[in-house]
Amino acid sequence: MPPAVLSAPAVAKKGRLPALTGLRAFAALNIVFFHFSNPKWFGPFAPIVDNGYTSVSFFLLMSGYILAYNYSDRAKSGELRAPTFWVARLSRLYPVYFFALIVSLGMLVQEWHVRTHMQFAAGVVMTPLLLQGWSPSLATFWNTPAWTMCTEAFFYLIFPMVVRWRRPKHLGGLTVNLFLLWLLGMVLPVLYLWLHPDGVLHPDRYTDGFWMRALKFTPPPHLPSFLFGIVLADVDAKLARDGYKRLLLGLGGVAGLYTILYFGDHMPYPMMHDGLLMPLFALAILGLAGRNLISRFFGFAPFVALGQASYCLYILHFNLWNLIHSSGLLEKTGLIQLDPWISYLLLITGAVLTMVLIERPAQRWIRSINQ
């Protein structure tokens, strides 16, 4: 009789990190306010809103962290299967992405008038395929914030490979890796500032040259942030969830972020957009991934609920806002006097409904047919 073969125990599922989900709500709202508000309305928080574009870099870094937090152990044990992972991520990403394109169909009329016929045809094909971000001129075609989903899709594609890369086992080596990835993230912004490829000596958020768009919207410049997040998950695994260290890290990250954003107008814009804040994002994430006063605040149930709809809010907000205001809905209903606050409420309501009625049912259906 052959000896029994003992299979390796399945990797335990990681615990949830509700405070980070709550933080996603604030980051998504900050992008909404950045696009559609006057930062001065927010008093002491004005510097955060005025530099709301940095929330996108935060999302990309946290994407690497969350994926590694959930999948690194499975990759090490051999349980991570790339096709299964891709289906899981696609079921989360694409239904809402496609719904947002349907909501944004009216934007194609405007795109037709400002693009060449070749550009328009390329945009119509590339955007549903999550490829538009690879073309600087087409990255914001059809749905402006959707370029980040092209970047995310690329990161999802490579994640099963890069998560298996050998990384240091000790905190010191991991810290060196984080530092090197941060420096790598600064290479392209520094080159842009040095070479002035668009002919702009002092680029800012309104600079719209080809090379600035390549720096802001194409996937490669954001890869160091994603990899930084993966390594950060290894650092996180070595720190106790309880204790004052996490609290101090979180406080240091939040204070550092506020300080840098307060002086945001004096910081090099390409670096701010593409990775300068990685270390401070990391401190904030490590702090909120613990059990302390800050994580309890961001883990407040309503914040977490909105954080779960943050992707829907992000991908829908730009064109849904324009649709609300171009339709005359607020004037016809007499709600215009409550604008913009009523518009923010409508965006949040639309995001939550999209999550409940489209994202989650579609996710369950796609996963069921793949089993």
Q: Residue spans of the language-model regions?
A:
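Aromatic-enriched alpha-helical transmembrane segments of multi-pass intramembrane proteins
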Residues: A122-W147, A153, L157-L277, F318, ...
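Alpha-helical transmembrane segments of multipass membrane proteins
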Residues: A100, S104, L184-P189, F281, ...
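Conserved beta-strand->loop/alpha-helix structural units within folded catalytic cores of enzymes
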Residues: L23, A28-I31, S63, Y94-F98, ...
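Juxtamembrane loop-transmembrane helix junctions in multi-pass integral membrane proteins
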Residues: A12-P18, W41-D50, F85, R89, ...
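Functionally critical transmembrane alpha-helices in membrane proteins and complexes, commonly lining
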Residues: G15-D73, S91-L101, A122-P136, P279-A284, ...
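Transmembrane alpha-helical segments and their boundary/interface "anchor" motifs
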Residues: Y53-V56, S72-L108, M118-T127, A153-Y156, ...
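C-terminal "closing" transmembrane helix and its immediate cytosolic amphipathic cap
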Residues: M1-V11, R166, R296-V304, F318-Q371
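Membrane-interface junctions at the ends of membrane-embedded or membrane-associated helices
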Residues: S72-E79, W165-G173, A233-L247, A289-A305, ...
